[in-house]
Amino acid sequence: MDIKGQFWNDDDSEGDNESEEFLYGVQGSCAADLYRHPQLDADIEAVKEIYSENSVSIREYGTIDDVDIDLHINISFLDEEVSTAWKVLRTEPIVLRLRFSLSQYLDGPEPSIEVFQPSNKEGFGLGLQLKKILGMFTSQQWKHLSNDFLKTQQEKRHSWLKASGTIKKFRAGLSIFSPIPKSPSFPIIQDSMLKGKLGVPELRVGRLMNRSVSCTMKNPKVEVFGYPPSPQVSGHCKNIPTLEYGFLVQIMKYAEQRIPTLNEYCVVCDEQHVFQNGSMLKPAVCTRELCVFSFYTLGVMSGAAEEVATGAEVVDLLVAMCRAALESPRKSIIFEPYPSVVDPTDPKTLAFNPKKKNYERLQKALDSVMSIREMTQGSYLEIKKQMDKLDPLAHPLLQWIISSNRSHIVKLPLSRLKFMHTSHQFLLLSSPPAKEARFRTAKKLYGSTFAFHGSHIENWHSILRNGLVNASYTKLQLHGAAYGKGIYLSPISSISFGYSGMGKGQHRMPSKDELVQRYNRMNTIPQTRSIQSRFLQSRNLNCIALCEVITSKDLQKHGNIWVCPVSDHVCTRFFFVYEDGQVGDANINTQDPKIQKEIMRVIGTQVYTN
């Protein structure tokens, strides 16, 4: 096979000649290779001009009339913790490899698509999701695309732009002054005072943060597609970018729009998740049965062994949360989501089905899940065989518990926040990139502080998968809402400890003195086991979260009980677990400068690493 790596580097031109260069590429180059379509040259040059020379690379396969176009998508805008949760390398671009007909380009067969990161060899699930999305996008575009159609649209567009000067100047203007998109993920700021505080530089930062932007035209009368955009996708990340710079730029723009919001869509059907409190951090499958079957068939849920090996303490916690929710008297309300698990003996049926809940069967399978401590002490395959003998649904249930978690949880080194007096400390991030971007914008305007949120261990199975929701006046509410609707927080640990221990029928709020007497016993009660034990030893668990909250006028402070009605203004940061009533100091106040300094020290090394 004749394979030649051909990279095209042509000099740019200005003024009146810019149109011909942009639309047709450099004709001298095409004269030597008549089989290479000039529109392909033009589209490649457009990528180089709008992005950079390094954003595209080409390899020709002359004897079979094929060409591979590698488009490099910069994902450095993702936070370090987000990229870790998604298992991508933010320092390395994602490569979209499209194979076209060299001589026919858009008139030829639909291009094949590969999505990869050169250094990311295993577990690149995000690439599978993006490949599926871009495949569907290309199939839709290919129904009306042709070289002549694209050339005609670009010529019309260029004629319209001539009065405004060169194309480069126009693009520069677009890159600076393009409006903030009207997107469900990034709503337009309506508050007039807020608009006043946001100057032009701040708007530019906001536009860069909100990378799920679609390319929308300021003048809606100018139609560059030849057909109106679908109303179903109008106004969010599924908007079809303009074709004015060619198909290669269009698909790059579409990929850039979709990447920051991949967590908001099902990895199988690409339909938006429906959650009470918006999207979560990790991409996941939706609850549609067809998607569940496809998800299982694709083998995406086969990562249990890796998770147990690399994050055994986290898996231990997830199982404990699932058990607490399943054994709760309120399980019909709080055990949500209910597992969707394919029957290993009959892959066409669901052994556990949210539409046909069977808590007794689920309890039996969960009881057969061996302790994570045991799993780490031997061969995972041998452990799996033992579980299969006990109950064939035990291992599939464990896979579901791991894969359905949509938050990023990492066990911290022992006693990172020493004032919390527990070895079971976790970094807990559940907010998707869109919410974190909105949170940071609000933080710049109003500032933030830290406060505790107490909720019983049985509630966290749902919180990790559905988010920290405003449960006031809903069936999820347990403690009342004396201070109105919102997420309840407190700067005082004793108050949150009280909420965290009230999940089993106790509805009276203990006084602070009672809590101090009951819980502040770290130095008076003999320890029956090492406090530094790696895994949870007991099923009698208490937990609280440490959250970062925006200090805007929306935050209502009623003494030491705070209520935040805006869910976007609360982000979980840390999670602490205590066993057998052994909890920390009940007098911790997050507003104490010493406490704040310690929190910021750990936050600086764990959350804002970039």
Swiss-Prot record:
Coiled-coil regions listed: none
Known catalytic reactions: L-aspartyl-[protein] + NAD(+) = 4-O-(ADP-D-ribosyl)-L-aspartyl-[protein] + nicotinamide; L-cysteinyl-[protein] + NAD(+) = S-(ADP-D-ribosyl)-L-cysteinyl-[protein] + nicotinamide + H(+)
GO BP terms, alphabetized: protein auto-ADP-ribosylation
Lineage: Eukaryota, Metazoa, Chordata, Craniata, Vertebrata
Post-translational modification: Auto-mono-ADP-ribosylated.
Gene: PARP6
Keywords (A to Z) from UniProt: ADP-ribosylation, Glycosyltransferase, NAD, Nucleotidyltransferase, Transferase
Modified residues (ADP-ribosyl aspartic acid): 580
Similarity field: Belongs to the ARTD/PARP family.
Name of the protein in question: Protein mono-ADP-ribosyltransferase PARP6
Domain PARP catalytic per the UniProt entry, residue ranges: 374-600
Known EC number: 2.4.2.-
Protein role: Mono-ADP-ribosyltransferase that mediates mono-ADP-ribosylation of target proteins.
GO molecular function, one term: NAD+-protein-cysteine ADP-ribosyltransferase activity
